[in-house]
């Protein structure tokens, strides 16, 4: 894994893997973000766009059930900007299973192409974060299980929903779903994936 900071305020993460035996590879990045800054409250007012028409419903153990479902008419539709908190407490079985958002999104961009997956905007600071990737999926986690035990910048605790994750990846539980994009890596093959977190300020 290689991390690069670029001149255009991008954190670029490049993943490469090889193997001498057939194996499963699905690398991702589980950093937490709060664009208001450390110790400045929850992320419920962050405005989020995810460029996906489908998401992966999960069981009570947060394992995908199978075929992706349309986001149309559900609290999972972020194709236009919504605040994270606008619908997170809706009476929805999937939100109940995850105690909020903790779901994979099937990105709309063409498979294996590098494209825009998500955009987050925090209105108080004006900070914007875009996620660009060549992965087929994006896991959106709204910090539903944060309890203050983990510390971030300045030693500030991550409390309930005070940070979010946008994790570019192949779909969770892919080895058990032959119809999902493959995560199998064989000898002689090279696994390569790239994800960029691009930061700017909206004035």
Language-model segments: residues:
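An exposed, glycine/acidic-rich loop-and-rim segment of catalytic or binding clefts
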Residues: 1-203
């Amino acid at each position: 894994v290689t991390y690069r900071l670029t001149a255009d305020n991008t954190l670029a993460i490049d993943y490469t893997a090889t193997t001498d035996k057939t194996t499963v590879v699905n690398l991702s990045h589980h950093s937490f973000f709060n664009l208001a800054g450390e110790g400045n409250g929850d992320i419920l007012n962050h405005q989020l766009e995810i460029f996906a028409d489908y998401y992966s419903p999960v069981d009570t153990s947060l394992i995908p059930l199978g075929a992706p479902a349309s986001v149309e008419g559900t609290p999972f539709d972020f194709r236009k900007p919504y605040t994270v908190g606008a619908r997170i407490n809706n009476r929805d079985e999937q939100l109940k299973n995850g105690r909020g958002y903790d779901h994979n999104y099937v990105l709309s961009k063409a498979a294996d192409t590098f494209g825009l997956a998500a955009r987050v905007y925090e209105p108080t600071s004006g900070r914007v974060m875009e996620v660009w990737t060549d992965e087929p999926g994006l896991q959106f986690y709204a910090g539903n299980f944060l309890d203050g035990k983990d510390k971030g910048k300045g030693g500030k605790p991550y409390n309930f929903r005070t940070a979010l994750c946008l994790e570019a990846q192949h779909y969770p539980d892919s080895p058990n779903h032959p119809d999902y994009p493959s995560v199998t890596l064989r000898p002689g093959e090279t696994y390569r994936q790239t994800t960029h977190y691009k930061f700017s300020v909206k004035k």
